[in-house]
Structure formats: structure tokens, C-alpha cells
């Protein structure tokens, strides 16, 4: 590991392993690393294989030889890929010396690489929230204090604000949500949403699944769970508010009545750079707020009746055990069905609710703490099967000319 100098700054370059290098977070992380060659160096890349040309370009630009591709067919086409197959990213982590592992893989398949990174002793810059949500107790048990640093802008903001007080001084944590592209819509209007509409986020540029999760507010539900797991604050002291401008990324309210907020224009390079260099800031990582021009910041309550995903996540988190893994797996199945045009937008959250209800009624074992990864995977398999049944019975997708934004 890199040691700090006498003034607290890091000595030497941090070796960074980038998992999910061809996605939105991964490509921006490589931009941050390339802009700061005195601070960081890339020692390995991992990707699924869908964007093979991008991965090969990244390999050429960084000069790394340690590359992992999950898609074996894509790996054969590329040639000279040392790690391939479903466990490629995990093996890459296990066999590559790194100071920082950035896990920007998509979905719960990031769980084993997350555990491998923690086992290696590297700092885990975690963008793959699903691995923490699916394997929460296992991940927390494997992590040393301070070993996990969040990449999500909201949790990065909380980590920064929490520097302003001690743990027993925290009254509540406040997560902000843009409200997504359908803020102010009714439940009836949401029934006619198309995948194209759900893929247009008003303030952030993200991958397709994260963008859809933001539109359904499932992403904020996942972030609620992640907040509890990362910072240990009870669910009843974590609040979600809508902030359409996405300038204030989260806030911490302390027992004396003061509130600290972290504000910056929407740019993921800021939380990425902070996670890579933690606890040190990287100069010039992103633009700052311009207070010389007139602007207004709005905050409003979340409509939990129209967007119940956050309260469903709260229920899953309070139930404990593998229930958060079930929440995530049910969403992945329902979201895939929506993107394929098989179900309506509203059916995504309805499917999650149905699967959680089934788990409450018929599978109480899932509320128990998992003993190992296999327990988590069993819960996810059960949830996916339940979700597939629910999807098969769900309302098909329809488009109405009355829907806002539909022509």
C-alpha cells in the first residue's frame, strides 16, 4: 500500500484495478486516472465483453496486460485475454496486486469480486452497490474499518459531511433524489411510459440500467439500503427528499440542529476521484458551483404513493437477512422485462412488491443472516423465479397519446 508523506499527501502512485471499465463509471474513472498520472496507474481492466472494441482501446491506451472478459466468445475474438469466463473478474482481483479496486460492474454479479477485493486488503472504491445490497452481512464482515469507500455521489457526499461531527452527534442522514424524468406524473400516466422515455435522465449521464432504476426510484431504494450498510444509521433516521437540480448530493443533520450539505454540479468524476484517492482530494477533478450567477435550489417530499420503491427498500432492509438481495434480484428481472417491452413501467415496482410479499409469507428463512455466498445466491435464484412468474402475469406494456412527452 502507498504510505503518506509527512504532510499527509500520498507518496507514489496508487495502483488501480478497474472492474467494469467500459461502462459509464469505468470510462470516467480512466479519464480521472489519465489526468493524474502522478497519483494513479491502471494495473488491470475487467468488462463483460459487450463493448469489446472499447476494452481493447483501453488496454492499448493504458498498456496493461491483466485484462478480464466475462463473455468467453468475446474473449476468444479479442485474443490474448488472460482471464475469461463468469469468474474472470474475481480471478483478476485475486491475482493482481492493487492498492485500489474500483468495482463498477453492473448487478449482483459484482458480489464475488467485491469479496475478493476486500480479502486482498485493497481499498474498495464501490460503485457496484448491488454487491453490497445483495451480500450486506457478508461484505461488512469481510471489510476492515474504512476499507470500503463509496463512489455513488450521494454516499460520497455523506462521507464528506460526516467528517463534520462524531457518530453520536448525527441526528439523521438525508439522501437527495432528482425525482427522475417522471417527477410529478401520476400512477396512471406512468403505465404508458416507454423504455426510451425511461432512458432519459434529466441531470445525470449513466448506463441504461442505472438510468431506468433512477426513473423508477428503485435506484434511490438501493441507495437507502446502501446508506444504512455503509454508515450504520438506522433506517428510521434516513430520509429521502427530491431535489430536481441535483446540486446538493446529500446532507447530514446533527443533534444541535445544524445541517451540513455537499454541493457540486452533477459530475461523477468528483466522487470517483475522491474514492480513488481517499481521504485526499484530487485538484481540478470537476467544476465547482458558480455562485456569481442567480440560481435556485428546490427541495420537496418524495411521493411514496406514486413511487413506492423507496419504502419497499426500507421494508426489505428492516427485515434483514437476504431480503435486500431479493429486492434487487426482483428488480433486475422486472426491469429487463420492461426494457424488452413485455411489461408496463408500473409493473417493475409491482413485481418487487409481490416478490417481497411472497418472501414474507412463504420464505421466512430469507430474513435470517446468510452464512455464505451460496445462501445469497439461493435467495436471488428464488427471487428471480418468483419475479419471472409475476412478470408473466403482469399487464403488458401500452402507450397512450395522453402520456406527457409522448407524441
Swiss-Prot record:
Protein name per the record: 1-deoxy-D-xylulose 5-phosphate reductoisomerase
Keyword Membrane: no
Stored PANTHER family: 1-DEOXY-D-XYLULOSE 5-PHOSPHATE REDUCTOISOMERASE, 1-DEOXY-D-XYLULOSE 5-PHOSPHATE REDUCTOISOMERASE, CHLOROPLASTIC
InterPro entries referenced in this protein's UniProt entry, alphabetically: DXP_reductoisomerase, DXP_reductoisomerase_C, DXP_reductoisomerase_N, DXPR_C, DXPR_C_sf, NAD(P)-bd_dom_sf
Amino-acid positions noted as binding 1-deoxy-D-xylulose 5-phosphate in the UniProt annotation, renumbered to this chain: 129, 153-154, 178, 201, 214, 219-220, 223
Pathway per the UniProt entry: Isoprenoid biosynthesis; isopentenyl diphosphate biosynthesis via DXP pathway; isopentenyl diphosphate from 1-deoxy-D-xylulose 5-phosphate: step 1/6
Cysteines paired by S-S bonds: none
Amino acid at each position: 500500500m502507498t504510505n503518506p508523506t509527512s504532510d499527509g499527501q500520498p507518496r507514489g502512485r496508487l495502483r488501480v484495478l478497474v472492474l467494469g471499465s467500459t461502462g459509464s463509471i469505468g470510462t470516467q474513472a480512466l479519464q480521472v486516472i489519465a489526468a493524474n498520472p502522478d497519483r494513479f496507474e491502471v494495473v488491470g481492466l475487467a468488462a463483460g465483453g459487450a463493448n469489446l472494441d472499447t476494452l481493447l482501446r483501453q488496454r492499448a491506451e493504458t498498456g496493461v496486460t491483466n485484462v478480464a472478459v466475462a463473455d468467453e466468445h468475446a474473449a476468444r475474438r479479442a485474443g490474448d485475454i488472460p482471464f475469461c469466463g463468469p469468474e474472470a473478474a474475481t480471478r483478476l482481483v485475486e491475482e493482481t496486486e492493487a492498492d485500489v479496486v474500483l468495482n463498477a460492474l453492473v448487478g449482483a454479479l459484482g458480489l464475488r469480486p467485491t469479496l475478493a477485493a476486500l480479502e486482498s486488503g485493497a481499498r474498495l472504491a464501490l460503485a457496484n452497490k448491488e454487491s453490497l445490497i445483495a451480500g450486506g452481512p457478508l461484505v461488512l464482515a469481510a471489510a476492515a474499518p474504512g476499507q470500503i469507500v463509496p463512489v455513488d455521489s450521494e454516499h460520497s457526499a455523506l462521507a464528506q459531511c460526516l467528517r463534520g461531527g462524531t457518530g453520536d452527534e448525527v441526528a439523521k442522514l438525508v439522501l437527495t433524489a432528482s425525482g427522475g424524468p417522471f417527477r410529478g406524473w401520476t400512477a396512471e400516466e406512468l403505465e404508458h411510459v416507454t423504455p426510451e422515455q425511461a432512458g432519459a435522465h434529466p441531470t445525470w449521464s449513466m448506463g441504461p440500467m442505472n438510468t431506468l432504476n433512477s426513473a423508477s426510484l428503485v435506484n434511490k431504494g438501493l441507495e437507502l439500503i446502501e446508506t444504512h450498510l455503509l454508515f450504520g444509521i438506522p433506517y428510521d433516521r434516513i430520509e429521502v427528499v427530491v431535489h430536481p437540480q441535483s446540486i446538493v448530493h446529500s446532507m447530514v443533520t446533527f443533534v444541535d440542529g445544524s445541517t451540513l450539505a455537499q454541493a457540486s454540479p452533477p459530475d461523477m468524476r468528483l466522487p470517483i476521484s475522491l474514492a480513488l484517492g481517499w481521504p485526499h482530494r484530487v485538484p481540478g477533478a470537476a467544476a465547482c458551483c458558480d455562485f456569481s450567477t442567480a440560481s435556485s435550489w428546490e427541495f420537496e417530499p418524495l411521493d411514496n404513493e406514486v413511487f413506492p420503491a423507496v419504502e419497499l427498500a426500507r421494508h426489505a432492509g428492516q427485515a434483514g437477512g437476504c431480503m435486500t438481495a431479493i429486492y434487487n434480484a426482483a428488480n433486475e428481472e422486472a426491469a429487463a422485462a420492461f426494457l424488452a417491452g413485455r411489461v408496463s413501467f408500473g409493473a417493475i415496482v409491482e413485481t418487487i412488491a409481490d416478490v417481497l410479499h411472497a418472501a414474507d409469507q412463504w420464505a421466512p428463512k430469507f430474513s435470517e443472516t446468510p452464512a455464505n455466498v451460496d445462501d445469497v445466491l439461493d435467495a436471488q435464484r428464488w427471487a428471480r423465479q418468483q419475479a419471472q412468474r409475476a412478470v408473466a402475469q403482469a399487464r403488458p406494456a401500452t402507450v397512450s397519446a395522453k402520456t406527457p412527452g409522448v407524441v
